[in-house]
Amino acid sequence: MILFEDIFNRAVNLFDDPDIRRAYELNPVEFSQTMRPYLINGLGMFANPTTVSSRFSDYTEAQGKLEVFDGDGGATYTLSTVPVDNSVMSFFIGKTPDPLAEYDPTTQKVTFSTNVPVGTRCSCEWYYAGEFKADFTGFSSNISPSFIASRTKDILAHCLLLGWAENEKNFMLDIRGILTDTDFKLHSPANSVRAKTEWYQNIREGLNDLTQKLSWDLWSGAIGGRQIGK
């Protein structure tokens, strides 16, 4: 099993862009909602090794809920829904993000970092992006499933970015929307990503390197260990 969020967490570092990271940190729910279709669309770029890539057709659907409260002068409010395990959460006081707010699953309570004035709305949104039901058993006995899963997360992160690169213009409009909604602005459109051609080529080469390494690891493990499957 591989959580979509684990892939998002790796992918955000590959963007190497402060504005994207700020969107990721300030509004993780909307960021994950934006990322999800690029991950799904990028799956087709994971072609080899087929013994691994063929295991990603089964994944769960996304779930989420937005809850809005009328401020009563306090900082703590109770959710009426139970967030799905491994969900990300975004908190707002009015239209201002509150990344320091906390959720206590034992009490179902959200505590904002400051008291919410009477008449001001605050909100908590949780979002579970999904997970791949991939099973990495059945390979050589000296290659652990956790090793294959880790390699695969890096591959999928690169696939996500390549899927994004095909729609860069629309994606950056989405990112601008996230930042605008939270009273933050992009410093400069030129800062959005590195020179597009070079950046795209680096990600493409990175994907090729990762898939080749995984293929080699599986082959060398099968030769060097007791093979229990293909």
Locate the predicted segments by residue.
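Conserved short "hinge" loops at termini or chain/domain junctions
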Residues: 1-67, 72, 76-78, 83-87, ...
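Amphipathic alpha-helical interaction surfaces
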Residues: 45-48, 52, 162-170
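Elongated alpha-helical scaffolds
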Residues: 149-169
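Short, surface-exposed beta-strand/strand-loop-strand elements in extracellular ectodomains
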Residues: 172-178
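Eukaryote-specific, cytoplasm-facing alpha-helical/coiled-coil scaffolding segments in long proteins
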Residues: 182-192
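Glycine-rich, aromatic-bearing surface loops/beta-hairpins
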Residues: 191-202
